[in-house]
């Protein structure tokens, strides 16, 4: 099990409160298998993996925003394609 120093991760993010929000968002992605971990899992829980990624500077609030925006765009495109497909099939 990897050891995570919360203070080092907080220093990367800026403060403990933003660290909690960022780590929770990332851990949720990992838990739902929406994204692959950027560090070896080493049988760690998603929260520990998220903190390790933050500590190494691989994830921050800005990166999380970009990932979520990209996911929303991809979802929108997929929905539009599905609507177009159904319209073609029915009409």
Curated annotation (Swiss-Prot):
The reaction(s) this protein catalyses: RNA(n) + a ribonucleoside 5'-triphosphate = RNA(n+1) + diphosphate
SUPFAM superfamilies on file: RPB6/omega subunit-like
Domain of life: Bacteria
GO biological process, one term: DNA-templated transcription
Pfam families noted in UniProt: RNA_pol_Rpb6
GO cellular component terms, A-Z: DNA-directed RNA polymerase complex
Oligomer status and interactors: The RNAP catalytic core consists of 2 alpha, 1 beta, 1 beta' and 1 omega subunit. When a sigma factor is associated with the core the holoenzyme is formed, which can initiate transcription.
Role noted for this protein: Promotes RNA polymerase assembly. Latches the N- and C-terminal regions of the beta' subunit thereby facilitating its interaction with the beta and alpha subunits.
Family: Belongs to the RNA polymerase subunit omega family.
Official protein name in the record: DNA-directed RNA polymerase subunit omega
Native source organism of the sequence: Actinobacillus pleuropneumoniae serotype 5b (strain L20)
């Amino acid at each position: 099990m990897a050891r995570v120093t919360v203070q080092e991760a907080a220093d990367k993010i800026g403060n403990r409160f933003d660290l909690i929000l960022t780590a929770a968002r990332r851990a949720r992605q990992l838990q739902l298998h929406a994204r692959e971990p950027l560090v070896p899992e080493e049988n760690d829980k998603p929260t520990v993996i998220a903190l390790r990624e933050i500590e190494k500077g691989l994830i921050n609030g800005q990166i999380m925003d970009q990932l979520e925006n990209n996911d929303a765009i991809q979802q929108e495109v997929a929905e539009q394609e599905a609507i177009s497909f159904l319209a073609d099939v029915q009409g």
